[in-house]
Each structure stands twice: as C-alpha cells, then as structure tokens.
C-alpha cells in the first residue's frame, strides 16, 4: 500500500552492514543436535557418514557462493539446511530422516589475518590431551590413532586444477577447473598457509 498511512512501518526495516576489508566468518551450528544425533542413532564418538554429509553441504555452499574462499564443517544457512535434507539418503541410506534438522548462523568479523588464523587455530586446537582422556575413558579409543578427519576436522578451499580433456577436434587440451576439495590438515602451523598463498592470508 504505497503512499498510505501504513507506509511508516517500512522505517522499522534495517539492513545490518558489515565492515569492509575484514575477514567475515560465518559459523553454522546445528540446533538441538545432541537430540537429533541420538534420535537418528549416529555412531559415537564420531559418525563418519554424518560428518561426510556435513562436508557435502559445505562443499555445495562453496560451489554456489564463489566469494567464500575457505570453510571450516542467512541464505547460506537456509541452503545448508536444504542440502542436508537433500543429500541425506546419499550418505545415510539405512536411516530414515525422522524430522528436518535446524541450523543457525552468525557472522563474526576478524580485522586481521592473524586474528583469522588465531580463530581457526582455536577451533582446531582444542586440547588434544583432554579429548584423548575422554575418548579413552568413555569409548576405549586412543585419540592419536583416529583418522585425521576426526582429529583435524574438515577444511574446504577453492582450488584451480589443470584437467586434460579431448576437444571437439579430437585433440587433447588442458583446461583449468575449479574444485572444492575436502582436506583434513593442520591449519595451526605455517605449512598449510605457505602452500596455499592463493588464499591471500599473510603468514
């Protein structure tokens, strides 16, 4: 109802602006996921298929939004939730999805490369000795013998690779292709950042 006495309500609509020239981290969390994982009988302490499903969702997001250069796993949260339901049967074919999952997202701004690296180090570097003790006492599992996926977490980045293919003339040509690999690596030390200078994060 344009130009009506009710139009004043539009003044309540505010766009939140984020600071430019900063690292914006969108953290997506499952809401009520302890109950969700119990109801769906996820393996404890780690369910590889369920984690692979999460990684696939993050990978799909990065394929859709090319501005995201790195993912460590409001339209994005919505798409993540949709992907989770869509790919459920691909990763957990023997389990019926009893109810849709719920995710929330928050954006945190980090003003420097060091701040971003410290955040990622904190996410990956929760005290391994505490994890070791917990896993051993509850599940008789040695933390140090777990696959990298469970110890390091999953990291996704945009990468350009060269791929050989045959063109319409039957000749072999090399073309660049964008991919989003799922990595399970140490991001606390400098080595990863030295290898991936294309991410633009100073060491």
Which residue ranges define each predicted feature?
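Regulatory and interdomain segments flanking nucleotide-handling catalytic cores
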Residues: 1-203
């Amino acid at each position: 109802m344009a130009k009506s006495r009710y139009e004043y309500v539009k003044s309540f609509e505010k766009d939140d602006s984020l600071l430019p020239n900063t690292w914006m981290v969108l953290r997506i969390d499952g809401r009520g996921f302890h109950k969700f994982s119990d109801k769906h009988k996820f393996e404890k302490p780690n369910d590889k298929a369920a984690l692979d499903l999460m990684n696939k969702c993050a990978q799909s997001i990065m394929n859709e939004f090319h501005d995201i250069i790195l993912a460590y796993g409001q339209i994005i949260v919505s798409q993540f939730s949709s992907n989770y339901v869509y790919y459920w049967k691909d990763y957990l074919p023997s389990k019926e999805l009893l109810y849709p999952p719920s995710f929330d997202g928050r954006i945190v701004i980090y003003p420097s490369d060091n701040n971003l690296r410290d955040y990622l180090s904190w996410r990956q570097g929760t005290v391994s000795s505490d994890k070791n003790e917990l896993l051993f006492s509850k599940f008789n599992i040695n933390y140090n013998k777990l696959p990298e996926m469970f110890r390091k977490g999953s990291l996704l980045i945009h990468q350009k690779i060269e791929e050989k293919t045959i063109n319409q003339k039957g000749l072999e040509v090399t073309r660049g292709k964008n991919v989003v690999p799922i990595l399970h690596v140490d991001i606390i030390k400098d080595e990863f950042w030295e290898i991936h200078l294309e991410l633009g994060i100073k060491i």
